């Protein structure tokens, strides 16, 4: 299985580069592509009806963490030999199911985001994947241009989110949420807020909102060709949260050099209640702009 995954990773990420930057597109529904707008991008119609669109960022980085949550994976026969250095990568794609479902600037869409932490250098234990989070979504999105105090609201999105690590007990972690995502931009600034409401069972992680809160805030700043980004979640009642800061810069037309720092709780589902600081550097195919 690991050999298959190693082969699939480059085969999956490389074709995505073709869609990471602006392509020759045909404007539809009077909603031209807008920098940083997921929904306006999905309203663009390519010649290929099976085109996949970036949803979140797509990257691959080599990382090292201040501490490793060995207790959470103690049932794995290799847990004591787990290493602090890992390859972390994220694949995030979206597909429009129905453009114009509720008007010319609306779309019914689906997305899939996968984030993995791979013990690549741990050859002694056959380089296992310590954790992988699978996050499919179904959503209704609107591209807008409402203006207020210099800001333009670009995306309004409402949907259902499932997030799971695909494990069985005792390492199973999952939760389901209804969410709203709002994205606005002002010049070189982008701000996105995504509040959510947890539904269904959280028996695997009953206190997850204690550490992950009820919303995510994302901020981006376009500095020349570089993009500085920050996102995080915080529970004001408990004082727990986590934040990620990233900086990317283009090195070719389709590839960006990317540096990332994550600090706090909730970097992954298995680490939702574990505090750490992780630093990584690698490549990215598309940033939030």
Swiss-Prot record:
Keyword presence, Membrane: yes
Protein's cellular compartments: Cell outer membrane
Record's signal peptide: 1-20
Pfam families: PLA1 (PF02253)
Chain positions recorded as Ca(2+) 1 binding sites: 126
Membrane topology, record value: Multi-pass membrane protein
Positions in the Extracellular compartment: 66-84, 119-128, 165-173, 199-216, 235-241, 266-274
TM stretches of this protein: 53-65, 85-99, 106-118, 129-148, 151-164, 174-186, 189-198, 217-223, 226-234, 242-250, 256-265, 275-286
InterPro entries: PLipase_A1, PLipase_A1_sf
Domain of life, source organism: Bacteria
Residues in the Periplasmic compartment per record: 21-52, 100-105, 149-150, 187-188, 224-225, 251-255, 287-289
Active site: 162 (proton acceptor), 164 (nucleophile)
Any Gene Ontology biological process: lipid catabolic process
GO molecular function, one term: phospholipase A1 activity
CDD domains: OMPLA
Catalysed transformations (reactions): a 1,2-diacyl-sn-glycero-3-phosphocholine + H2O = a 2-acyl-sn-glycero-3-phosphocholine + a fatty acid + H(+); a 1,2-diacyl-sn-glycero-3-phosphocholine + H2O = a 1-acyl-sn-glycero-3-phosphocholine + a fatty acid + H(+)
Residues involved in Ca(2+) 3 binding: 204
Residue positions binding Ca(2+) 2: 167, 172
EC number: 3.1.1.32, 3.1.1.4
The UniProt record lists the keyword Hydrolase: yes
GO cellular component: cell outer membrane
Family per record: Belongs to the phospholipase A1 family.
Record's subunit section: Homodimer; dimerization is reversible, and the dimeric form is the active one.
Function statement: Hydrolysis of phosphatidylcholine with phospholipase A2 (EC 3.1.1.4) and phospholipase A1 (EC 3.1.1.32) activities.
Protein name (record): Phospholipase A1
